[in-house]
Amino acid sequence: MAPSPRPQHVLHWKEAHSFYLLSPLMGFLSRAWSRLRGPEVSEAWLAETVAGANQIEADALLTPPPVSENHLPLRETEGNGTPEWSKAAQRLCLDVEAQSSPPKTWGLSDIDEHNGKPGQDGLREQEVEHTAGLPTLQPLHLQGADKKVGEVVAREEGVSELAYPTSHWEGGPAEDEEDTETVKKAHQASAASIAPGYKPSTSVYCPGEAEHRATEEKGTDNKAEPSGSHSRVWEYHTRERPKQEGETKPEQHRAGQSHPCQNAEAEEGGPETSVCSGSAFLKAWVYRPGEDTEEEEDSDLDSAEEDTAHTCTTPHTSAFLKAWVYRPGEDTEEEDDGDWDSAEEDASQSCTTPHTSAFLKAWVYRPGEDTEEEDDSENVAPVDSETVDSCQSTQHCLPVEKTKGCGEAEPPPFQVAFYLPGQKPAPPWAAPKLPLRLQKRLRSFKAPARNQDPEIPLKGRKVHFSEKVTVHFLAVWAGPAQAARRGPWEQFARDRSRFARRIAQAEEQLGPYLTPAFRARAWTRLRNLPLPLSSSSLPLPEPCSSTEATPLSQDVTTPSPLPSEIPPPSLDLGGRRG
């Protein structure tokens, strides 16, 4: 592991307070504070900090470069420090501590200012000496997940940290004049990147750049637009650092000493996306513009990454789905009935997705099979080879496409017949035909029957009845079959027999009374009935014989009374004897 630039026993205030990363409000306040306290804002305490850093660089040019080892004994560390360096660093720390910082404002400072000891002043000065030109290492949970930019002023053992992303090199104070000019040119290129539409890239803090940056701050405030008014501290690394702390190689550091800013710019690798984090988890969740608009093809992922503009919009991997998926424009094409050649060409071109299963070929419905008109007289004629080939080619066509191959005729239009009085009725419609599949099955069944007697033509045959009668017994359930065969006629038969029996009994009893002799005697008796007596003095007429009978008057309609009911002649109607 590479040594840390600051003591390991000191915890950063962001590490001590883990809820800083979990609270969106704290993150928002931190970004706002970093933006307000950026290098472009003309604050008094920031100007003093920059001036102190410049003084440190000027003093360091007169002294040999510090040793890159961070964990030195206290005796060597105290012995190597110079009074000029310690004095400038102490003045810088005191000036920064005098101002208010975000950790102090929020109450997140972990180190109390009263915890310092007088004997540790030399150690603090040496820490400032080592951290002046070294990159600031962020906490482990902040390196990939949340990279807060801007100046972070933390009161940790009296050390002031600048959060500018620094280059991967050490020994910055011992730099040549040519390197200084290269740094200035790279800084001018980075300053020009604040224009609108610029994508953030890696920004490098190089010693000797503070003077040029301080002069640019005044001119940039007046020229920058709203999109370019953001602080340069927001420019952060757009890619993950490929090298971890334990994989840092000294050869790469030496190569970066000559041109530190150019190496940082070369690491960009061209224009990168505007949002990129150092964690794979954030890469999966960070929104990148254009991700939701790219069309991906499941069947060919490699070709979709290379050229997504020429891929199919609705890919389907199944041949069965390809056959049934609706494609716009297929049913809107106008087809000419007389142009069979063009229809066959279209059918051959559209037959690109054959069914892979024999089961689907047998059961999948193809439009046009039931509308094909076949002549009954041509059933025996052989089928041409060309027609067979064209039919085989159209068997694989899509169901939605309307092909005219293999002699398929257009279905007849809907017919309506109007019968008007006094006009000749329309001819009868043709009988509906079976679908093509059923016609083929019937043809296969009728084929052996036609070949039984080939000498006799079809139209010359006569109907012959066989003398041998075959009786087929129908096996049915007794209960339901008998109940169905009975019906109401059985009840009618019972009633009819009952009524006939009653009629016979009545005729047997009334038969003697209906004879002509009995009828004559009855009329005679009715004719000889006595009239009612008006008075008692009138003599009663004697009964006359049948020869003396006179025609019966029409007034007498009552039958003759029985002999027992005839009153005696001497009995008066009034109940008195005469």
Curated annotation (Swiss-Prot):
Protein family membership: Belongs to the PPP1R15 family.
UniProt protein name: Protein phosphatase 1 regulatory subunit 15A
Annotated region (Interaction with KMT2A/MLL1), positions in chain: 363-462
Region Disordered, residue ranges: 101-122, 158-314, 330-353, 368-393, 532-578
PTM notes: Phosphorylated at multiple Ser/Thr residues. Phosphorylated on tyrosine by LYN; which impairs its antiproliferative activity. Phosphorylation at Tyr-236 enhances proteasomal degradation, this position is dephosphorylated by PTPN2.
Topology versus the membrane: Peripheral membrane protein
Signal peptide positions (record): none
Keywords attached to this entry: Apoptosis, Endoplasmic reticulum, Membrane, Mitochondrion, Mitochondrion outer membrane, Phosphoprotein, Repeat, Stress response, Translation regulation, Ubl conjugation
UniProt GO molecular function: eukaryotic initiation factor eIF2 binding; protein kinase binding; protein phosphatase 1 binding; protein phosphatase activator activity; protein phosphatase binding; protein phosphatase regulator activity
Chain ranges on the Cytoplasmic side, renumbered to this chain: 1-21, 40-578
Organism: Rattus norvegicus (Rat)
Pfam families with a match to the protein in the record: PP1c_bdg
Keyword Mitochondrion listed: yes
Region feature (Interaction with SMARCB1): 443-490
Modified residues (Phosphotyrosine): 236, 365, 419
